[in-house]
Curated annotation (Swiss-Prot):
One of its GO terms (molecular function) is structural constituent of ribosome. NCBIfam families: L29. The lineage of its organism: Bacteria, Pseudomonadati, Pseudomonadota, Gammaproteobacteria, Oceanospirillales. Gene3D superfamilies: 6.10.140.1970. GO terms for biological process: translation. This is Large ribosomal subunit protein uL29. GO terms for cellular component: cytosolic large ribosomal subunit. Belongs to the universal ribosomal protein uL29 family. The gene is rpmC.
Amino acid sequence: MKAKEMQEKSVAELQATLIELLREQFTLRMQKATGQLAQTHLLSQVRRNIARVKTVLNDKAGN
């Protein structure tokens, strides 16, 4: 998801997206720990998406 798309969402939608991404990150970390994760690049993608959502949330809180 692009930052432009996130800026158009409401705060509630962004918070829901953040929770979803955190759950996905947890699942991926557990899969990596048990050796089931073949696509390790997904971890960094999810981490960056979490950072994007948090950045947009902080921008909206500042306004």
